[in-house]
């Protein structure tokens, strides 16, 4: 497997719709308008999250069960800023819609700006031929409230191209998160 460069990412986005909307350079803001960077980087693509968040709450004192998840455990927040309570988490979705090629596996890593504040971004790999908006999980590991900014960089996607195509892709096996849009809760 080899990691793919900015040239490859740009070509795949522009010619094959791999990332939509696509920002072909890294946006950093200006002196009077600082933003957490997003867009193409040397060997990855920095994604943004939308302004729709689902913040976890324990008001129902429910048990967290991935096979029987209670959607009432979340509070919907529509804002350019999301405050995550101490030792809690929130879900969001990428602005970008992805179409992963059959011979590519995509890994998501959190941005160091957030990690240095105790905010961890978790996403499972984007498998070959998966497509959709990515549901992002932000964990606040601190004992203070933490802030996430919508429409700014939150994580980086790395694209790994295999030496050979997989026998069965995510699309072939009709994966349960295929084509997801918006924040998607656990499915079994």
Curated annotation (Swiss-Prot):
Catalytic reaction equation(s): dCTP + H2O + H(+) = dUTP + NH4(+)
InterPro entries (UniProt xref): dCTP_deaminase (IPR011962), dUTPase-like_sf (IPR036157), dUTPase_trimeric (IPR033704)
Gene3D superfamilies reported for this sequence: 2.70.40.10
Keyword check for Hydrolase: yes
Enzyme Commission identifier(s): 3.5.4.13
Highest rank taxon of the organism: Bacteria
Keyword Repeat set for record: no
Biological processes annotated in GO: dUMP biosynthetic process; dUTP biosynthetic process; nucleobase-containing small molecule interconversion
Pathway: Pyrimidine metabolism; dUMP biosynthesis; dUMP from dCTP (dUTP route): step 1/2
Alphabetical keyword list: Hydrolase, Nucleotide metabolism, Nucleotide-binding
Residues at the active site: 137 (proton donor/acceptor)
Any one Gene Ontology molecular-function term assigned to this protein's record: dCTP deaminase activity
Binding site for dCTP: 111-116, 135-137, 156, 170, 180
Subunit structure: Homotrimer.
Family of the protein in this entry: Belongs to the dCTP deaminase family.
Function according to Swiss-Prot or TrEMBL: Catalyzes the deamination of dCTP to dUTP.
UniProt xrefs under PANTHER family: DCTP DEAMINASE (PTHR42680:SF3)
Protein name per Swiss-Prot or TrEMBL: dCTP deaminase
Biological classification of the source: Bacteria, Pseudomonadati, Pseudomonadota, Gammaproteobacteria, Pseudomonadales
């Amino acid at each position: 497997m080899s990691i793919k460069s900015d040239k490859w990412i740009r070509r795949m986005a522009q010619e094959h719709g791999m990332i939509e909307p696509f920002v072909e350079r890294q946006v950093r803001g200006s002196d009077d308008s600082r933003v957490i960077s997003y867009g193409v980087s040397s060997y990855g693509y920095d994604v943004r999250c939308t302004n729709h968040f689902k913040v976890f709450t324990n008001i129902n004192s429910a048990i967290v069960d991935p096979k029987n998840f209670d959607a009432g455990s979340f509070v919907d927040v529509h804002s350019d800023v999301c405050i995550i309570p101490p030792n809690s988490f929130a879900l969001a979705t990428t602005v970008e819609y992805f179409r992963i090629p059959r011979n590519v596996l995509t890994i998501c890593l959190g941005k160091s700006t957030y990690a240095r504040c105790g905010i961890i971004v978790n996403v499972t790999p984007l498998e070959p031929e998966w497509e959709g908006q990515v549901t992002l999980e932000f964990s606040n590991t601190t004992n203070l409230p933490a802030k996430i900014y919508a429409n700014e960089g939150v994580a980086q996607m790395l694209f790994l191209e295999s030496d050979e195509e997989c026998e069965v892709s995510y699309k072939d096996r009709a994966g349960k998160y295929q084509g997801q849009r918006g924040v998607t809760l656990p499915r079994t």
